[in-house]
Amino acid sequence: MATESTTNTTTIIARADQHDIDLHKASDRVNFGSIKEPIDVPYLLGVQTDSFDWLIGNERWKARVEEDEKNGTNTVAHTSGLDEVFNEISPIENFAQTMSLTFSDPYFEEPRHTVQECKEKDYTYSAPLYVNAEFENGDTGEIKSQTVFMGDFPLQTPHGTFIIGGTERVIVSQLVRSPGVYFDRQQDRTSDKEVFGAKIIPSRGAWLEFEIDKKDQPQVRVDRKRKQSAIVFLMAIGMTKSEIAQAFKDYPLVLDALEKETLGTQDEALVDLYRKIRPADTPTPEAGKNLLDSFYFNTKRYDLARVGRYKINRKLGVEADFNDRSLHQEDIIATIKYLVALHDGAATFPGKRNGEDVDLRVDVDDIDHFGNRRIRQVGELIQNQLRTGLSRMERVVRERMTTQDAEAITPQSLINIRPVNATIKEFFGTSQLSQFMDQNNPLSGVTNKRRLSALGPGGLSRDRASMEVRDVHPSHFGRMCPIESPEGPNIGLIGSLATFGRVNPFGFIETPYRKVVNGHVTDEVEYMTADRDLDHVIAQANQELDENGNFVQKSALARVGEEEAVDVPVSSVDYMDVSPRQMVSLGASLIPFLEHDEGHRALMGTNMQRQAVPLIESERPLVGTGSEWRAANDSGDVIKSEKDGVVTYVSADLIRVMNDDGTTSSYKLAKFQRSNQTTCYNQRPIVHDGERVEAGSVMADGPAIQNGDLALGKNLLIAFMPWNGYNYEDAVIISQRLVQDDTLSSIHIEEYEIDARETKLGAEEITRDLPNVGEDAVANLDERGIIRIGAEVEAGDILVGKVTPKGETELTPEERLLRAIFGEKSREVRDTSLRVPHGETGTVIGVKEITREDAEEDGDELPNGVNQMIRVYIAQHRKITVGDKLSGRHGNKGCISRILPEEDMPFLADGTPVDIMLNPLGVPSRMNLGQVLELHLGWIAHSGWDISLDPNLEAEWKKLIPSGAEKAEPNTPVATPVFDGVKPEVLKGLLSTTLPNRDGDRLVGPDGKATLFDGRTGEPYTKPISVGYMYMLKLHHLVDDKIHARSTGPYSMITQQPLGGKAQFGGQRFGEMEVWALEAYGAAYTLHEMMTTKSDDVDGRVRVYGAIVKGDNLPPAGIPESFKVLLKEMQSLSLNVEVLNAEGVAIDMKDEDDDPASSADDLGFNIGARPDAAAKEDQKAEEPEYQ
């Protein structure tokens, strides 16, 4: 953030250090925030990169472990994920336990390809994983050691993504219930008594549930089976009655149950337990013991995980080591004691913490509390898949140990890596948590990587998720954003990590607080999990402080436990929030005046920023929040200098820097690449020759970034006024200027691919020589049959010429020999060229060709049966047009209804026409007042201001202006941080001190309104109108992608009705309700035509086509195909159905119609398949027929 301070907390300097601004290391915004943040926002992609570093145990992770050990903070896991999982599975022993296989020291070789190569050639960015495997033969004492290849392991790119098969993907973090012990309270259905229960939930293994029923009897449920006495269970795990009596001497409820228990020994208890769990089997004490051991005491099958042990220790006050991941007798005893204390209504429970006796609070658990929900990050998710793959491999190893000759066994011969590779590949390719990366703009990419999802394997399902799970919870504060969430069925199940949130080694989200000592706020910052919040009194970040950091007021508004915020004496405050934007996510923190927007609209605004399309020329917002710099900087879309140095060479695609240490660094820029969302990904240098850079300086902007600041849209002159009804119901009127100046134009790049395969009838061929195609259609193809770069193409144009052999029979060996000797006579081929699909157009900007020969030379991999693969890239220049969707940052979205000539737009007194007219009725009912305040501050920033122009030197609002923000030149970008922004009274004061224009006039008055003149008549409007600059975004919902029309096209094979949807070149559905509408009007002929000729009367539509071509009257309709399908369906149910005519005579329904194409030929005209419809043929599951 650009605000800085030394000791004085209230006075802040409004601009960043000029040195940093000059080096592109900070934003030059004038900041109106009044609160100094004691720490920087953590690295925004850390939630992805830190976790993967831990998994593979790389140098970055080792450095963090070293620092952690030095500081003694215990914020980093000290064993890497791969080491953990290989240690768990080792040793693999055979059934006789005479042989063992142990794994250790996993390591990676260098990746085979760079990230860029993987994107270009459809590879997976991965590195070979090796592990040291040691086989020991217990009979002979022989040990064989080998380094074993465990397959190619996908690696993370520096920006937290994975390249899988050439496409960029993100693994989303998952929100799940933490392992541990949970207590709940439920009302008994038959009586009014409350029934208390406890569940011990492991990370892996069977649940163990205890309950005190309505008769006050302690019960246990093993692995979700029948309930039985908890006393029997205690005896079964090895406790005698006297030991139980001693352990529970202070708990009469347990002692009463013990007296009533008739069983006397452990064996009897085991038999009783086994009988109830497995009623079909013969119960014996050994079987009972083996069953219990396999459920709860076998470390291979039962795992609490470190986090489960941590939660049990914390809840029950036991002190087992965090690495002890199994369940113990002490845990079970403590669980029952706590449950009895809860049942008896006790307030506290004796336990231990850090070696001291403490009284723990007794209460039921809230499962939606963030102390009980944890994050499975990318590293843990991949580790779990690896664990699954290795356990499958373990079975193979065991089998091979028994079948292979003991003398000849080597580690390599035992190991089969296929199951490991298959599980990892399946996870990256098909898991719900492995998502196609959102590359619409830099913000959408960062948000995608910071997303938290409660869905996925082991999580919730959207159909069964309750309102409670979806709702905002007090423990979300500073951890998960209460605003950013989808609007559909996933609302509340998918969230976003808060700005300052970070994930601790146990997977719980922590948020930072400033420590308060005796009413003095220090700069010491402590990160806390949600369950620690409850034990402290925490004040808000905007609590007023004096220059020494002491509270100005005697009392402060604070959170105490889970109660509503209350006023407390400042002496009792323990902590204070670090920043007002602490509670919201990055996306929400980019909305200026968020505090004045209603929640639902803020949610829409946050989501719509992610849909903004990068424009040809990016322009950063005049009114920002100060988060723009960080969002762009951490997105990975800017190029930053790695070392201090001087720029020696700059071109559009390369920057070279001579570093101070004598080395030279070269930085390659991405030029006009296609993103996952078909937007244009392009980087531009912002440094020049001879310029000094420091490590971390931004040297090149990415898409939707200007000078290192996020720039999603444009600053446009807005007037809030209706105009002839054209902006009714959120419609938007824009000026022709935005079209002709390419203000809101964007570039979209589509990729089209074709391959030439080996078929049964011979090889397909890429060629310019196509059957039945005129010279003009192949004019833009080169001699190979591939389109030239720079060609302008439209729907139906040929991009790559291809012919496929056609014929019914396979050639005999003799025929093939003769053809090989004498060359081919005119072979029967059909044209299967790649054509531009319907509705698409543009300029060819690139062609990539891979042939089998090239592939073998370069080591590229082409799929089996493919001889040649060609990709064509077409760029579209899309100007803003009627039907496109525009939006602001406050959920104020609208569709363009009219583009007015510039001269017809209303204009200001100096002749400046406005760019956009918005309907003022869009504000009051939506309650997103932030847009109006942004409008006014936008005008102030555009005009410039000088507070000395207000003659009242003692004006109260002037005291709220931070130092450095007293005056500014026109077009100075400003920042108004969320919840700490420009106050309305300051806004009013600044409006009265804006700089006059060159004529000496102030066009907008102190109330933010201006006199506008009608562009058509030149007359002034009767009332003044709110005018100012607002940041408007062009969203990805472009009319060019949605508009669609069809005359003839593909039909469904079964029903013979037109297919649906633009992708299939389908028709418009005339549904049930539309039929009712025609029925209501009695439009019988129209209705008849809709349901026969225009739908699925195959003969009829051919005859109608012929009649239209010849100019004849339309023939009567025939029988719809769907009627025949209905008859067939009834016949399949063994119903004999006959169709009778008016005279009652049975009509012979033809089973098979004549081929429609031949019927057409009989009528003397030809109807063929539309070439552009054929391009989408393979996208439909049902085989379409063409008419």
From Swiss-Prot:
Ranges of Basic and acidic residues composition bias in the record: 1173-1187
Catalysis performed (reactions): RNA(n) + a ribonucleoside 5'-triphosphate = RNA(n+1) + diphosphate
Enzyme Commission identifier(s): 2.7.7.6
A UniProt-annotated Pfam family: RNA_pol_Rpb2_7
Superkingdom of this protein's organism: Bacteria
GO biological process: DNA-templated transcription
Region of interest: Disordered: 1150-1187
Keywords recorded for this protein, A-Z: DNA-directed RNA polymerase, Nucleotidyltransferase, Transcription, Transferase
GO terms of molecular function: DNA binding; DNA-directed RNA polymerase activity; ribonucleoside binding
Enzyme class: transferase
Keyword Transcription regulation: no
Cellular component, GO, one term: DNA-directed RNA polymerase complex
Family: Belongs to the RNA polymerase beta chain family.
Function: DNA-dependent RNA polymerase catalyzes the transcription of DNA into RNA using the four ribonucleoside triphosphates as substrates.
Subunit structure of this chain's protein: The RNAP catalytic core consists of 2 alpha, 1 beta, 1 beta' and 1 omega subunit. When a sigma factor is associated with the core the holoenzyme is formed, which can initiate transcription.
Name the record gives this protein: DNA-directed RNA polymerase subunit beta
Organism name: Bifidobacterium longum (strain DJO10A)
Gene coding for it: rpoB
